[in-house]
């Protein structure tokens, strides 16, 4: 099995949710962790954890990542609002994100733990 880490802004457009669902259903991939980025990363982490739980992968840890770019300047014309919820979700999400580590620390730990983890970047 190929070990993968998924860094996502799930909760915006449907693409990240579909990618997460496809990864969960793959017999060739093992998701070792998920981190969230962009704006309200805690809400995104809860959405990711909910999707994982619904897909029978509730044991996969989800980490809250950075709300703003670490190095680059924010270039979108709409002001960045780290408190804005991703899209509008009427239903309650029941997932819980891991907050003992930040996403960068968690990914670093995973890369050291799983030497064979796929660390390619896809956008």
Model-derived features with residue positions:
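N-terminal acidic, glycine/proline-rich low-complexity segments
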Residues: 1-123
